[in-house]
From Swiss-Prot:
Pathway: Pyrimidine metabolism; CTP biosynthesis via salvage pathway; CTP from cytidine: step 1/3; Pyrimidine metabolism; UMP biosynthesis via salvage pathway; UMP from uridine: step 1/1. This is Uridine kinase. It comes from Escherichia fergusonii (strain ATCC 35469 / DSM 13698 / CCUG 18766 / IAM 14443 / JCM 21226 / LMG 7866 / NBRC 102419 / NCTC 12128 / CDC 0568-73). GO terms for molecular function: ATP binding; cytidine kinase activity; uridine kinase activity. The gene is udk. CDD domains: UMPK. The lineage of its organism: Bacteria, Pseudomonadati, Pseudomonadota, Gammaproteobacteria, Enterobacterales. ATP binds at G15, A16, S17, A18, S19, G20, K21, S22. Belongs to the uridine kinase family.
Length: 213
């Protein structure tokens, strides 16, 4: 955990795929933005930092284990977090779930008072943990995560149910048990039941609001 005197406060939200991380992050962002303004709070998804695979064929790209820490460019993410803390803007990568690689365009992100960082593998990397002012683990039962993942990937990402189930059995569940669930020990706060846990969201809002005082 970092010293809170840093210009940019980084809050990490981790948990299984489809556990409700993005919902919690977006809810906190939306409700806190109404209080403090868009210029003071932002959200960065860890998914933006999947490694560039433009040099690989599509056949090779789809074989990537996206739930293993090696799929992430955590070195670039670390560099960007440190830049934001220094007060410098970053060029946020844009990742395509359809093309399975990083796009050419980037999005400029200016430093904010608070950045909410959310992703499945955040707490598996000690370097990233050291940059977080505090961290949250969203603890949702795997059967619920699977149902949400099927709905999301089929409806929003154009995948077949068979491919989603195959990936879940081959990599998603094993990687959760090997890497993600053990990283829960590093979280400062554990949130059960995902993004619809209103009491937990209100507690988190109160905690984050302290950084704006």
């Amino acid at each position: 955990m970092t010293d809170q005197s840093h210009q940019c406060v980084i809050i990490g939200i981790a948990g299984a795929s489809a556990s409700g991380k993005s919902l919690i992050a977006s809810t906190l962002y939306r409700e806190l933005r109404e209080q403090v303004g868009d210029e003071h709070i932002g959200v960065i998804p860890e998914d933006c930092y999947y490694k560039d695979q433009s040099h690989l064929s599509m056949e090779e790209r789809v074989k990537t284990n996206y739930d293993h820490p090696s799929a992430m460019d955590h070195s670039l993410l670390l560099e960007h977090l440190q830049a934001l803390k220094r007060g410098s803007a970053i060029d946020l990568p844009v990742y395509s779930y359809v093309e399975h690689t990083r796009m050419k365009e980037t999005v400029k992100v200016e430093p904010k008072k608070v950045i909410i960082l959310e992703g499945i593998l955040l707490l598996t990397d000690a370097r990233l943990r050291d940059e977080l002012n505090f961290s949250i683990f969203v603890d949702t039962p795997l059967d619920i995560c699977l149902m949400r993942r099927i709905k999301r990937d089929v409806n929003e990402r154009g995948r077949s149910m068979d491919s989603v189930m195959a990936q879940y059995q081959k990599t998603v569940r094993p990687m959760f048990l090997q890497f993600i669930e053990p990283s829960k020990q590093y979280a400062d706060i554990i949130v059960p039941r995902g993004g619809k846990n209103r009491i937990a969201i209100d507690i988190l809002k109160a905690k984050i609001s302290q950084f704006f005082e």
